[in-house]
């Protein structure tokens, strides 16, 4: 009815009749991958379009699969798309040292990616971890990864900035810088 190519949402837990205020991770298990894939397949049938699931940050390790393996299981079983948040891959690596960005990306089928997200993150000394705040400039490592992925796949990159949003002129300067870094040959 809306004519959209796909609908996107975070690959995170939710509940009936309850509101969760943060993106809680789904346990990274084969059982949960099948359960989630079944729900995504059903939703795609009802909506009449593909769903693109976005990888989330997680602040505790859950399950026996690596996040990329879980994501790929869900994608394969449901035939859904991926909205790949490059910043979240970096944040999860910094916090857990479980799966390097290179190892993560080796498990992702880039042909299923609809587009990429980049954002800023910050270290929170109180919690002693990095937090996906979307409140600062994107770090160079994240930009470099997104650039490589975009060049390989031909997919677009979206900048997210949700908190502590600066003046429009500052955002435009950041976008111009990001664009020049992404489009440069080096």
Where are these regions (language model features)?
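Active-site acidic/histidine proton-transfer and metal-coordination neighborhood
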Residues: 1-82
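Conserved, mostly hydrophobic/aromatic
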Residues: 7, 51, 85, 116, ...
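Active-site beta-loop-alpha junctions enriched in small/polar residues
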Residues: 11-12, 56-58, 87-91, 118-123, ...
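Gly/Pro-rich active-site loop or hairpin
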Residues: 23-33, 92-154
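Alpha-helical packing segments of well-folded alpha/beta enzyme cores
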Residues: 36-39, 43, 145, 149, ...
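Catalytic cores of glycan-processing enzymes that make or break glycosidic bonds
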Residues: 37, 41, 161, 186
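Distinct, well-ordered alpha-helical segments
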Residues: 61-77, 92-106, 169-172
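C-terminal helical cap(s) of enzyme catalytic domains, especially alpha/beta-barrels
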Residues: 167-186
């Amino acid at each position: 009815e809306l004519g959209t190519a796909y609908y996107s949402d975070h690959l995170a837990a939710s509940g009936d009749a309850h509101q969760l205020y943060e993106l809680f991770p789904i346990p990274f298990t084969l059982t949960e991958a099948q359960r989630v894939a079944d729900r995504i397949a059903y939703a795609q049938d009802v909506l009449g379009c593909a769903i693109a699931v976005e990888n989330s940050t997680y602040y505790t390790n859950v399950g026996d699969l690596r996040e990329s393996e879980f994501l790929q299981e869900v994608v394969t079983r449901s035939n859904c798309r991926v909205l790949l948040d490059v910043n979240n891959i970096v944040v999860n690596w910094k916090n857990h040292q479980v799966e390097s960005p290179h190892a993560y990306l080796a498990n992702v089928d880039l042909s299923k990616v609809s587009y990429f997200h980049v954002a800023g993150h910050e270290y929170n000394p109180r919690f002693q971890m990095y937090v996906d705040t979307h409140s600062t400039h994107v770090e160079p490592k994240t930009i470099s990864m997104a650039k490589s992925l975009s060049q390989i796949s031909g997919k677009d990159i979206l900048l997210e900035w949700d908190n502590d949003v600066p003046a429009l002129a500052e955002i435009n300067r950041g976008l111009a810088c990001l664009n020049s870094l992404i489009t440069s040959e080096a």
